[in-house]
């Protein structure tokens, strides 16, 4: 069953560094120093079934808006709930995202902090598996030299 946590490995981090030629980015050193603690958090986080493929075209809404049904379950997997929150928010406008979060309710800030780090590695790993590095992963490469260190530091506060 699909699990993003399976992609958070030292081997995949090394492969990303090599394929993207970002070995010298200071964020990698900080991530590797904290890898064991982050992996421990990843093992301990509350687990659930995750959809992993939210996009509005994968949803059918009743004509009277009384119910909705998601379909296209090829990425159905296991993980922590915030992965689906991230996936939903990534495809919504800012206004729609605020409405979604209002209805969704509270989420664990430690889980979000964990996802803010792990999802970068997972997404870069998946991008590096492609023959040509995709445009949608470029912002994450840029993040290595900007906000990724801050995200790792924030996550350390939850350890």
Which residues are covered by each model-predicted region?
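Active-site Asp-x-Gly
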Residues: 62-103, 107-109
């Amino acid at each position: 069953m699909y699990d993003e946590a399976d992609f958070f490995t030292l081997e995949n981090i090394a492969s990303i560094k090599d394929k993207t030629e970002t070995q010298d980015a200071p964020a990698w050193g900080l991530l590797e120093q904290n890898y064991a603690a982050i992996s421990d958090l990843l093992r301990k986080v509350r687990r659930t079934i995750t959809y992993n493929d939210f996009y509005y075209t994968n949803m059918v809404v009743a004509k009277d808006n009384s119910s909705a049904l998601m379909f296209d379950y090829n990425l159905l997997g296991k993980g922590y709930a915030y992965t689906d929150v991230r996936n939903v928010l990534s495809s919504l406008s800012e206004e729609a995202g605020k409405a979604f979060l209002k209805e969704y309710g509270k989420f664990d800030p430690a889980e979000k902090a964990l996802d803010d780090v792990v999802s970068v590695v997972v997404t870069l790993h998946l991008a590096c598996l492609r023959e040509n590095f995709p445009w949608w992963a470029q912002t994450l490469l840029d993040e290595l030299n900007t906000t990724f260190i801050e995200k790792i530091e924030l996550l350390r506060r939850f350890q």
